[in-house]
């Protein structure tokens, strides 16, 4: 497995290095995208594909009276995310568990916000996975997607060739999948760097 395969499912030493790099490398994109998300201070939030947990930490600050749960199907990512958010976990404001978006381990209508940073590229069955997100969102809840690639630049093809199982979606494609899952009020935002943020409501 190549080092870049660890972007999909970090494992072993290479995975630990990749997770640490992701926590740092995606911070500017996450900060940009979060301008389009305004969660309530007491919101219940789920971060899907939480990676090394940096975005969980940011979401906990955005929701000082709320709780944030994270899932990732990589054990390496879960371990790192738990370390990064150890204080919040000890305070009962955060949990991180190993799970897949294909079958979210939560009851229906549990979250006001579900986030997905740099992860939908690797979701196995986007239509079904979006329906799972829809299921766990409360009515009126927001699904927030933030990607560093928008499927419209030449460099995007390079990454899909290097990383097996990666699919880069345009905002138009994501909107179609979201509508198919039942979402409405879909909005997309892009910048000159090719970053993409999409929000949708249940």
Place the predicted regions along the sequence by residue:
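A short SAM/SAH-binding and catalytic strip from SAM-dependent methyltransferases
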Residues: 112-126
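A short acidic, Gly/Pro-enriched loop at the edge of an enzyme's catalytic core
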Residues: 102-113
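Conserved alpha-helix/loop element of class I SAM-dependent methyltransferases that forms part
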Residues: 24-43, 58
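A generic alpha-to-beta junction signature in SAM-dependent methyltransferases
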Residues: 37-39, 62-63, 137
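A short glycine-rich, Lys/Arg-flanked "PGG" loop and its adjoining helix->strand segment in the class I
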Residues: 127-139
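Class I SAM-dependent methyltransferase SAM/SAH-binding core
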Residues: 44-103
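C-terminal alpha-helical "lid/dimerization" subdomain adjacent to the S-adenosyl-L-methionine
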Residues: 10-23, 27, 142-199
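Short glycine-dipeptide loop
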Residues: 42, 137-142
């Amino acid at each position: 497995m190549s080092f870049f395969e660890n972007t999909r499912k970090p494992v072993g030493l290479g995975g630990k290095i990749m997770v640490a790099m992701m926590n740092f490398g995606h911070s500017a994109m996450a900060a940009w995208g979060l301008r389009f998300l305004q969660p309530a201070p007491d919101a219940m939030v789920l971060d899907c594909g939480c990676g090394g947990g940096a975005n969980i930490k940011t979401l906990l600050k955005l929701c000082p009276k709320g709780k944030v749960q994270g899932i990732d199907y990589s054990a390496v990512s879960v371990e790192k995310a738990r370390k990064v958010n150890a204080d919040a976990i000890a305070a009962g404001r955060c949990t991180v568990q190993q799970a897949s978006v294909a079958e979210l381990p939560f009851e229906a209508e549990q979250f006001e916000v579900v986030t997905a940073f740099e992860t939908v590229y690797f979701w196995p069955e986007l239509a079904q996975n979006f329906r799972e997100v829809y299921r766990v969102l409360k009515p009126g809840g927001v699904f927030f997607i933030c990607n560093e690639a928008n499927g419209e630049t030449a460099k995007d093809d390079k990454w899909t060739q290097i990383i097996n199982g990666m699919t880069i979606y345009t905002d138009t494609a994501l909107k179609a999948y979201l509508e198919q899952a039942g979402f409405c009020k879909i909005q997309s935002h892009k910048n000159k760097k090719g970053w993409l943020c999409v929000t949708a409501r249940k």
